[in-house]
Curated annotation (Swiss-Prot):
Keywords: Coiled coil, Cytoplasm, Endoplasmic reticulum, Lipid droplet. InterPro entries: FAF1_2-like_UAS, Thioredoxin-like_sf, UAS, UBA-like_sf, UBA_8, Ubiquitin-like_domsf, UBX_dom, UBX_domain-protein. It comes from Xenopus laevis (African clawed frog). Residues 302-354 are annotated as: Disordered. This is FAS-associated factor 2-A. The gene is faf2-a. Residues 12-53 form the UBA domain. Residues 303-348 have a biased composition (Basic and acidic residues). CDD domains: UAS_ETEA (cd02991), UBA_FAF2 (cd14414), UBX_UBXN3B (cd16120). SMART domains: UAS (SM00594). Transmembrane segments: none annotated. GO terms for cellular component: endoplasmic reticulum; lipid droplet.
Amino acid sequence: MAALEERELSQEQTEKLLQFQDLTGIESMDQCRQTLQQHNWNIEAAVQDRLNEQEGVPRVFNNPPNRPLQVNTADHRVYSYVVSRPQPRGLLGWGYYLIMLPFRITYYTLLDIFRFTLRFIRPDPRSRVTDPVGDVVSFIHLFEEKYGRIHPVFYQGTYSQALNDAKQELRFLLVYLHGEDHQDSDDFCRNTLCTPEVTHFINSRMLFWACSTNKPEGFRVSQALRENTYPFLGMIMLKDRRMTVVGRLEGLMQPQDLINQLTFIIEANQTYLVSERLEREERNETQVLRQQQDEAYLVSLRADQEKERKKKEKQEQKRREEEEAQRKQMLEERKKRNLEEEKERKSECLPAEPVPDHPDNVKIIFKMPNGTRVERRFLFTQSLSVIHDFLFSLKETPEKFQIVTSFPRRVLPCLPSEEIPVPPTLQEAGLSQSQLLFVQDLTDD
């Protein structure tokens, strides 16, 4: 595009462009062309303006009745408003300009050489940013000491933090770079920036961040925004999902001029913020909907998991109950087999029933718990344990039982105990030749 623009220039304009670049040492051809256009291709006025700007001396020419305003057309996405310096007027002005021109060129050439050499010896201390917040707060304090407390609300944070907040809040961010050595900075701050109408306008429409270019943080931002002169204001906003400079205001402006230009930039770019806000709301709604769907899915998943857990728990409980029932059944069957084996063993070990006419015969009738009667003969000399073993060997006898006499009622000690280690004989127990004994079930005791 630069080559196309150069082809659009006349031969005379091209020669002036190259001559101006040689005199000022500006590397950017676009900047040289812009400066010449601001001065209506008056090379003497353009060179004088550039030298005055670098030197920081007061203006030597009177202000014109109307300040020419320039719009940067190199990039149609960025609106540029530049207040150009006045051209020399009259013989006195041109005479002073022509006399001072060689001295200024020599002075600034030597100054540039000195600065270039000094850069290798001692790097610019502003290039090291160690406390960006401190730089901003320090500038605010110095600003209020010099210009008072009536001013737009300064963002008390770093440039990066201001960018992030403007992005998050979808607001315009106005950046002011304060050139302390520039002759227009004091006038701008005192008579434009700190006026009530400008203060109210900025506070109600945008975030406002400012810093001096003499501070490391301000110098770093200056390197990024690449301002041409002071005062400098840059309007930044979220555009196409990136923080973009959409407006550049340079030079001394009156309050109403500043408000008009800021209003123009806002109105020209408001649709981008509205579009971004709608997209963000749509993304938020989509995110909320997705979150609600995820929550509903999680609720359903938890319900299914709880249902599955209860099902498994019920199955596990049923399995344990079945295993416990099987275990008890096996124990019961084993116990039953052991009892049957014990009954059979006791039956095999019983002494033979004595004959009816034996002199020591004892006839005993047992009344069982189920009401049946069992009769058998024993000998007086036999132990009561024989009676117990006989009853134990019977199928209808319960597992645990005791033998009780009818009158007087007493329990016969048929099994060994601590008190009676050896059970007595039938005779010692006081049984008669014909005896009725009761068998009591002790299984449930």
